[in-house]
Amino acid sequence: MDSTMMPHTIRQNTIFGKTNFAQQKLGLYQVVAPASPVCSRPGSSCSQPPTLLGNNPGVLTPTGSLSPSSFKPAIMLETEFGDNPYYPSTPPLSTSGSAVGSPKSCDILQTPLNPMFSGLDGFSGVKSGFESIESSILSWTSCDSPPMTPVYIYSQPSRVPSLSSTTSDLSNIPCPSLSPSPAPYARSVSSENDVDFCDPRNLTVSCTSNPSLSDFTLDCLIEEDSSCSEQGSIDTSVIVQPTFDFSPAIASGLPAFEDFSDFESDNELSSLVKSGGVYRPRACTGSSVVSLGHGSFIGEEDFSLDENETLRFPSPSPPSIKPVDNSHKGKRRKKSSEDTRSVEPVMNTAATAADESQTVEVEQSDRASPAPSESNSSAGADTPSAPLPAPTNRRGRKQSLTEDPSKTFVCDLCNRRFRRQEHLKRHYRSLHTQEKPFECNECGKKFSRSDNLAQHARTHASGGAIVMNLIDNVDPSAYDAGVVAPPSVDDHANYGKVLFQIASEVPGSASELSSEEASDNGKKKRKRSD
């Protein structure tokens, strides 16, 4: 007995131990745990609770499957997905007969229109290319379909009777059409079900939503021909117009567009339809295109200072002020005449005292007595015109002989124009006065320009070249950055007269007179060994 009962006792003790452990572990579920196996297994383990608790899968599986109440709605939603399809609480939109970019008579596109753009087809400027065609199709008097019903535009309710009085079929519409186009179907597909749609009779109509035919045609077809609207042709003047003429009284938040100021011309056009009257800018007219262009009146000296850093363009005197002419040719003449008049004050303000005397005397000898200067010549003048330009092939560097207004400094002897004052003074020394104040220290060769001396000094090994004066009675303080001043006023007056007659007698002699020196020559002449 003891040996046979011992395993049972041990087994019972083990089971009781597990039972106590399970009761301590489950804690709050001690009352609930025996109830579920009793219902599922009524005949096997109800009589012996230890044997019932000893069946571990039978006890622990129902206990473990007991979950908190928060997970129960998840199981409920998973089972109801395929069993209970339902409509959304918001009434769905009905299918309209058109979309934004399609004509109103198209029955194929059934995409509902965005309620933000409802009622825009009646405004001027929107779909203006189709207005002439649609005006005959959408005639309110011959329209058998339900009337145009713009939705979601909240405005005065006083317009509702005028909309409902246009036709007797308003009560037959079960759902609204969000486009102003007539709905091709009396009832939509989704309206067959018992779903509550909004009643279009309770909707308000905007003040700009074309309640009548006259309002519809006067806004967008006021400038079109009546024949074009009847025949269905598209007017190009309406298509070209890119401006939107939205009324600011729309309550749906649409912005009121205005004309762009960038497209306005000088005469302030009201619209771009009359684009044929737009004038070109004054700088782009035919005369200026053939001539110097936009920057012709602005030279390089306007943006850079001279070495002397003086005011290059003084204020004009009262006699030099003239009324501005509208023609560009006269404007250029005025500029060139001002340049010739302003040579004297520019030379006076920017040069030294000796340079002032040289320029004044040369100009006076040129303007006061051009004919006597010719009569003083020893050989006699052959040409009647005194100021003759120098040959174009005189210099290696290309110099324009045209009357460029940007070149404000003019030579009085040869009418050559320069952009900078130092260029004009260098021109006087090298060509007209034949001054050579720069002498090489090695070979003793003299030059009229310092850059020519520096170029020549590279040929010598030592490179020694100093600046020496050619004339004895010259004050050393007269040197200004390598520029030598002439000795006296009388000599400069004689220089101007003699050189003026030389230039008038032999026009081609200017290049031969200055060819011995390397002043301003091309690269081929500057590479000479002598």
Curated annotation (Swiss-Prot):
A zinc finger (C2H2-type) spans 409-437, 438-465. SUPFAM superfamilies: beta-beta-alpha zinc fingers. GO terms for molecular function: DNA-binding transcription factor activity, RNA polymerase II-specific; RNA polymerase II transcription regulatory region sequence-specific DNA binding; zinc ion binding. Keywords: Cytoplasm, Metal-binding, Nucleus, Repeat, Transcription, Transcription regulation, Virulence, Zinc, Zinc-finger. One of its GO terms (cellular component) is nucleus. InterPro entries: Znf_C2H2_sf (IPR036236), Znf_C2H2_type (IPR013087). It comes from the Eukaryota. Pfam families: zf-C2H2. Disruption phenotype: Increases the yeast-to-hypha transition rate, enhances conidiation capacity and aggravates pigmentation. Leads to sensitivity to stress. Significantly reduces microsclerotia formation and decreases virulence levels. It is found in: Nucleus; Cytoplasm. PANTHER family: AZ2-RELATED, ZINC FINGER PROTEIN 142. Transcription factor that acts as a key downstream transcription factor in the HOG1-MAPK pathway. Plays crucial roles in the regulation of dimorphism transition, aggravated pigmentation, conidiation, microsclerotia formation and subsequent virulence towards Spodoptera litura larvae. More specifically regulates the expression of genes involved in antioxidation, pigment biosynthesis and ion transport and storage. This is C2H2-type transcription factor MSN2. It comes from Metarhizium rileyi (strain RCEF 4871) (Nomuraea rileyi). The gene is MSN2.
